[in-house]
Every structure is written in structure tokens, then in C-alpha cells.
């Protein structure tokens, strides 16, 4: 990528809309727009004060064609999104106007922007760091209000500031270590070792605090993969319909109606759920149903959360017991349905098998217990804590991996200090921790990783 050229792209979604926006960034942005834009007052944009919206038309002078009626804004660098000169053309929405305007801009000397290149330039030009750049994509793809708020906080630098503070503390450690190494002809005193150990352990705690938020952050970013399991005709499809508040799955009294998994994406109290209603798990000779059962088991193994449904009106069957044994090692909710009927189920046996898992009594036909189910989901995701809008969460898997590597290196450093190993070994561990944290903010990343990150962005962002 060349920062000295001028790029252009359509910045709005494809399709019919009220307006469309074409964005230009680079040192030739003003020169290019003045070749194609005619303002109503007849002035060139270079003769109009920046940060004003100017009415006029986009004209293809070579073909003597008026392309569209537009509003154009010019923002002079460095106080822009990319820190470069930026022009935005607001035209009529739809595929044709933006496409024709972009083609004209490219003919006048701009280059078609790569995916995420505007944000990448903002990063490379120092306006934002890499964590903030990634937050832009999280903001665009947020599935819930909470996810949006967390992304906005990261865009404003909440994670970056926390990571930078830890990195600065690691630099202080490195300074102490290097001074001690410079005087290597003298023994390292206990005071120095105690100080380094104290610093290391305090930084360890801070990294662990960040890592503890990663599971919740991942759910807010990607959704909670939740699988409803149970034997046939226990109410799995009815639960899916009740949570969706619409009839999505077929509900009958015939066991085995759901032959394949049904997947829905929706929000419950700000939690994005990827909810999968699976075929009932049982022994069957039906080939199609058997395939569905095998798929159910595959979804079960990959799930973040299992919702196991049992039938209160029947005694526990070998199938129930088999599924409960599988659930023991997973994060799970146990829902006992059909509590409106005479109870035949052994609750003590359920508790004996699943242990501390939450057991909720519900009746889908009477619509009772659903609120408690929603509350349990919130408790599982937020681990019983109340999350404020300005909560700092680690939502990016790349950030989590970097924090884990930093923690591992720092833990090695702590052990080296405790064992009174040469400080050169400690220095390597502390430097590795610093490098790992630098990957979050972009201080220690290569071009290949940057390309990989930004290729997932939208064109025009």
C-alpha cells in the first residue's frame, strides 16, 4: 500500500437508499473533486472554506454529461479520519449514481481503495492504534446495544490506555533489569529481586483481570452458541418458538418431527444468541432422523452453552440419563418442561447427576418460567456481574491470544526471579511480554498481519 497516492471508494451499503456516499482520501483529493464538481455559485472547492457542505453537480466534462445532483464536503488534513485531505460526495442512493461517480473519480487519478484502507491509513498515520482500528469493525458489526457500547469504548481508547499502562510498567522493569546487568560485576541484591518480583506479580494480576473478561467479550462479539438438546417430544422446538416469540420450528406430538438442526440468531436482554434446536437424541432406525441425531451430537460438542430439556410428566429414561452425563462437563441450563402436568420426574436424581447446574421448572404451554430462563442466560454470560455501558471487555480473539502470551512470558519471568536465575533470562521474558502486548496496539506487528486484519473490513471503511 502506498500512502502517497489518493484512494476512493463507495462508503455506503450497496442497494437502494436515500443517499449514497463516495469517499476520497489523499493529497490529490481536492484537485480531483475540482475537476468533476460544479458548485451552484460557480466556485471551485479549493476556494471554499473547508468543513462546509456545498451544493452542486458532478459533471463528466469529457462526455459532457451531468451525472448527479450532490452535496460535497471537503475536510483538510490532518484533522480528518485518515489525517489526509478527505472529500465526501453525498449523492442519490442506489447502485448507478455512486458507481458512475466512483468510475469518474478513478478516471481522474484516484485509485480504488482496498478493504479497510481508510481505517488502515488512520492507523499508519498515527491517528488511532490497531486496537482502535479493529474496534471500528466491531462497531459496524455489533449485534447488540451492549456490543456497540463496548466497541465504542474501545474506539475511544479504553483498552489501548489499559494496555499502554501495563506496557509502560514493563518498560520500567526492563530499565531496572538493564541497570542491574550493566553492573553485572556486582551481585544483584535482594532488594532489587524483591522489587522485580513485586512488579512482575502486580502486572500479572492486571493481565489476568483483562483476560477474565474475554469469554463475555467473545460472546458479545460473536454470539453465544447455544444448543437445545433432549429426547424427542420434550419441547425443544416449543422453547425455540417461545424465545423467538414466533413459530419458527414445527411443533407436533409426534416424536422425531425435527429431523435436522434449526439455527436462529437473535438477542435476549442484550445477549446475542446463536440458538440451535436439534433433533431429539434417541436410538432410531430412521435413516434421516439418525443423520439428524448425529448432527445434534456434533453441535453439542461445539456449543458454548447447552440447554438440556427434560419432561416433568415422565420418569427419567436411559436417554435422559445419557444426555445428563454428557452435560456434566459443559456449561449448561437444565429446563424441566411440562410442569403443568402431574410430576413423575426425580429431581433429586437430576441434581445428583448434574451437580451445581441450574435447574429451572417451566411450562411452555402456560408460558411460565421463561423470564427465569432469560435471567439465567444473563447470569451465565456476565457471571453474576452487572455490566455498565462503559465496561472494558476484551472482545477480540487476537487480543486475548496476545494477552495470554504476555501472561505466559511474565509467569516465566516470575519463576526465573524466584529461582534467582541470571537477569538476562528475566529480561528476555519481560521483553517477550512487552512485545506480545504491542501486538494489541500495533507497535510490534508486521505488514502481513495488518493485511490480514484489514482485509476483513468493508470497502470504503
UniProtKB/Swiss-Prot annotation:
User: Cofactor(s) for this protein?
Assistant: K(+)
Q: Where in the cell is it found?
A: Cytoplasm
Question: Superkingdom, according to UniProt?
Answer: Bacteria
Keyword field contains tRNA processing: yes
Q: Which PROSITE patterns match?
A: G_TRME
- Classification via HAMAP family: GTPase_MnmE
Kindly state the subunit structure of this protein: Homodimer. Heterotetramer of two MnmE and two MnmG subunits.
Name this polypeptide is given: tRNA modification GTPase MnmE
Amino acid at each position: 500500500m502506498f500512502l502517497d497516492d489518493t484512494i476512493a471508494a463507495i462508503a455506503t451499503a450497496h442497494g437502494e437508499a436515500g443517499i449514497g456516499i463516495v469517499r476520497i482520501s489523499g493529497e490529490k483529493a481536492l484537485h480531483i473533486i475540482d475537476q468533476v464538481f460544479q458548485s451552484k455559485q460557480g466556485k471551485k472547492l479549493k476556494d471554499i472554506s473547508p468543513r462546509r457542505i456545498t451544493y452542486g453537480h458532478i459533471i463528466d466534462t469529457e462526455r459532457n454529461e451531468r451525472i448527479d445532483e450532490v452535496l460535497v464536503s471537503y475536510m483538510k488534513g490532518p484533522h480528518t479520519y485518515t489525517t489526509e485531505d478527505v472529500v465526501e460526495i453525498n449523492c442519490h442512493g442506489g447502485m448507478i449514481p455512486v458507481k458512475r461517480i466512483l468510475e469518474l473519480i478513478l478516471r481522474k487519478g484516484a485509485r480504488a481503495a482496498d478493504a479497510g484502507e481508510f481505517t488502515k491509513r488512520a492507523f499508519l498515520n498515527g491517528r488511532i492504534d490497531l486496537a482502535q482500528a479493529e474496534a471500528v469493525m466491531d462497531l459496524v458489526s455489533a449485534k447488540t446495544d451492549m456490543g456497540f457500547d463496548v466497541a465504542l469504548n474501545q474506539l475511544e481508547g479504553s483498552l489501548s490506555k489499559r494496555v499502554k499502562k501495563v506496557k509502560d510498567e514493563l518498560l520500567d522493569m526492563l530499565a531496572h533489569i538493564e541497570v542491574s546487568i550493566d553492573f553485572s560485576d556486582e551481585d544483584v541484591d535482594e532488594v532489587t529481586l524483591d522489587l522485580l518480583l513485586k512488579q512482575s506479580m502486580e502486572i500479572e494480576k492486571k493481565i489476568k483481570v483483562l483476560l477474565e473478561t474475554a469469554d463475555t467479550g467473545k460472546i458479545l462479539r460473536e454470539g453465544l452458541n447455544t444448543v437445545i438438546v433432549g429426547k424427542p417430544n420434550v419441547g425443544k422446538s416449543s422453547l425455540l418458538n417461545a424465545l423467538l416469540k414466533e413459530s419458527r420450528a414445527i411443533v407436533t406430538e409426534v416424536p422425531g418431527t425435527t429431523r435436522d438442526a434449526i439455527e436462529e440468531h437473535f438477542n435476549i436482554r442484550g445477549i446475542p444468541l446463536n440458538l440451535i434446536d436439534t433433533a431429539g437424541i434417541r436410538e432410531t432406525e430412521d435413516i434421516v432422523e439418525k443423520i439428524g441425531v448425529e448432527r445434534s451430537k456434533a453441535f453439542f460438542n461445539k456449543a458454548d452453552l447447552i440447554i438440556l430439556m427434560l419432561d416433568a410428566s415422565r420418569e427419567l429414561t436411559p436417554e435422559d440419563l445419557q444426555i445428563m452425563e454428557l452435560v456434566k462437563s459443559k456449561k449448561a441450563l437444565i429446563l424441566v418442561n411440562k410442569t403443568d402436568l402431574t410430576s413423575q420426574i426425580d429431581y433429586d436424581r437430576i441434581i445428583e447427576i448434574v451437580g451445581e447446574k441450574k435447574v429451572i421448572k417451566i411450562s411452555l404451554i402456560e408460558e411460565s418460567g421463561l423470564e427465569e430462563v432469560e435471567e439465567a442466560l444473563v447470569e451465565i454470560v456476565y457471571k453474576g456481574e452487572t455490566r455498565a455501558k462503559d465496561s472494558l471487555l476484551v472482545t477480540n480473539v487476537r487480543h486475548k491470544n496476545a494477552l495470554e502470551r504476555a501472561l505466559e512470558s511474565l509467569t516465566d519471568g516470575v519463576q526465573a526471579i524466584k529461582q534467582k536465575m541470571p537477569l538476562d533470562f528475566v529480561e528476555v521474558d519481560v521483553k517477550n511480554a512487552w512485545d506480545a502486548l504491542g501486538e494489541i496496539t500495533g507497535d510490534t506487528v508486521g505488514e502481513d498481519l495488518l493485511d490480514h486484519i484489514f482485509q476483513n473490513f468493508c470497502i470504503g471503511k
